[in-house]
Amino acid sequence: MPHRKKKPFIEKKKAVSFHLVHRSQRDPLAADETAPQRVLVPTQKVNDEERRAEQRKYGVFFDDDYDYLQHLREPSGPAELIPSSTPSTYSSRGEEDTSVFPSTGIKLPSSVFASEFEEDVGLLNKAAPVSGPRLDFDPDIVAALDDDFDFDDPENLLEDDFILQASKPTGGEGMDMLESDGDDGNEWEDMDEGGSDGCGSTGPLSDGGDISAPGSPREAMKKHLFWEEETKSRFTEYSMTSSVMRRNEQLTLHDERFEKFYEQYDDVEIGALDNAELEGTIQVDSSRLQEVLNDYYKEKAENCVKLNTLEPFEDQDLAANELDESEKEETVTVVLEEAREKWDCESICSTYSNLYNHPQLIKYEPKPKQIHLSSKTGIPLHVLPKKGLTAKQVERMQMINSSDLPKVSTQPRLKTESKEDKKARKQAIKEERKERRVEKKANKLAFKLEKRRQEKELLNLKKNVEGLKL
């Protein structure tokens, strides 16, 4: 049966290859989380021979796969649009969703390719800070940022009490009135001078602009002045008015409770603190350690009595004892002993045996004897035992049975031996040698059989061990 050539799954000549690259920052879909961040870019197949022939025209004779012509082209050359001669058979919806490659007939979604239209500025450049002059900024702010602000101009300076001046109401201008809400009193509304009906005040305004009638905006303003709420907190150096939330009755009560609680932790109220177990290291030559030792020695010196300050014991019967001692004279023998060498702490501790210290007496070890060699044999002298049997060898010889020793071969030959005795002695020697040969042959055969048996057991053991390996 003839072998049929199998059609390849991918035809290399008609196949289209792609490069998987990151999506461009100027692509509008780069900020879309649902769109893939990597796209496919089709590779451009160029014939190597044609490319090399084109390179030779421009004087490039390198024989490698690199395209040197890309450096010779103009970066922004003229572009020409050539319309397609074959009309598209796909609908507009199909063009948006898929991309068709006629060489393979494979349809891929458009989301896996880069967008056709790109923005002029990428996402990273949009997020970068803008440098240069900003025309949309206030000129005064720009001048202050550029250090062109005139601090010597009195109009640019603020008064020390600008907060108080800003909080004082003026007669000719409109005044903002604050009205507490019925629920919690923290809602305020802006009211004009003419809208007196909205605030519920019944008193008329005076000509001088003085608002003193009960229920008037002036009286409402006095209840909520800024400097009345300026109260420092014990917990921080900031005031309560620096809080974002306006302080109503409940918040004020909450603040007062906190202030009362923190009064217990003032410097004058804090008592002795608990002793904390601190661990650490300190240098031996530290000044702090030296001060502590000096204080300790001073305290001990005050509580102890020195020997040179001892006073004699005052006896009450001193007068009577002096009379008796004057009558009796005693001879006292004073023995002066030589001062012994005292042991210090280090020498005492050195007598204790531990893992690293093994105290013992230092002994004088004599030098080993020098080894002398024999001039004849080269063997060390006085090393090998002397000739003759040792005591152990003599004891072993006595334990040997005399029947096991050869009889004829060890018997001395007498000088007065006759021919018959000589013939009998030689015949006995022959018989003894014959028995010795038989015994030697039997021993050799026994050793040979034992060697075979042991080799067979060793082979079986080796096979069993190899069979147990995993």
Curated annotation (Swiss-Prot):
<feature type="compositionally biased region" description="Basic and acidic residues">
    <location>
        <begin position="414"/>
        <end position="437"/>
    </location>
</feature>
<dbReference type="GO" id="GO:0000056">
    <property type="term" value="P:ribosomal small subunit export from nucleus"/>
</dbReference>
<comment type="similarity">
    <text>Belongs to the LTV1 family.</text>
</comment>
<comment type="function">
    <text>Essential for ribosome biogenesis.</text>
</comment>
<dbReference type="Pfam" id="PF04180">
    <property type="entry name" value="LTV"/>
</dbReference>
<keyword id="KW-0690">Ribosome biogenesis</keyword>
<feature type="compositionally biased region" description="Acidic residues">
    <location>
        <begin position="176"/>
        <end position="195"/>
    </location>
</feature>
<keyword id="KW-0597">Phosphoprotein</keyword>
<dbReference type="GO" id="GO:0005654">
    <property type="term" value="C:nucleoplasm"/>
</dbReference>
<dbReference type="GO" id="GO:0005829">
    <property type="term" value="C:cytosol"/>
</dbReference>
<feature type="region of interest" description="Disordered">
    <location>
        <begin position="23"/>
        <end position="54"/>
    </location>
</feature>
<feature type="modified residue" description="Phosphoserine">
    <location>
        <position position="403"/>
    </location>
</feature>
<feature type="coiled-coil region">
    <location>
        <begin position="414"/>
        <end position="470"/>
    </location>
</feature>
<dbReference type="GO" id="GO:0042254">
    <property type="term" value="P:ribosome biogenesis"/>
</dbReference>
<dbReference type="GO" id="GO:0042274">
    <property type="term" value="P:ribosomal small subunit biogenesis"/>
</dbReference>
<feature type="modified residue" description="Phosphoserine">
    <location>
        <position position="243"/>
    </location>
</feature>
<feature type="compositionally biased region" description="Polar residues">
    <location>
        <begin position="399"/>
        <end position="413"/>
    </location>
</feature>
<feature type="region of interest" description="Disordered">
    <location>
        <begin position="75"/>
        <end position="103"/>
    </location>
</feature>
<feature type="modified residue" description="Phosphoserine">
    <location>
        <position position="326"/>
    </location>
</feature>
<feature type="modified residue" description="Phosphoserine">
    <location>
        <position position="17"/>
    </location>
</feature>
<dbReference type="GO" id="GO:0005634">
    <property type="term" value="C:nucleus"/>
</dbReference>
<feature type="region of interest" description="Disordered">
    <location>
        <begin position="166"/>
        <end position="209"/>
    </location>
</feature>
<feature type="region of interest" description="Disordered">
    <location>
        <begin position="399"/>
        <end position="437"/>
    </location>
</feature>
<dbReference type="GO" id="GO:0030688">
    <property type="term" value="C:preribosome, small subunit precursor"/>
</dbReference>
<keyword id="KW-0175">Coiled coil</keyword>
<dbReference type="InterPro" id="IPR007307">
    <property type="entry name" value="Ltv1"/>
</dbReference>
<feature type="modified residue" description="Phosphoserine">
    <location>
        <position position="24"/>
    </location>
</feature>
<feature type="compositionally biased region" description="Polar residues">
    <location>
        <begin position="83"/>
        <end position="92"/>
    </location>
</feature>
<protein>
    <recommendedName>
        <fullName>Protein LTV1 homolog</fullName>
    </recommendedName>
</protein>
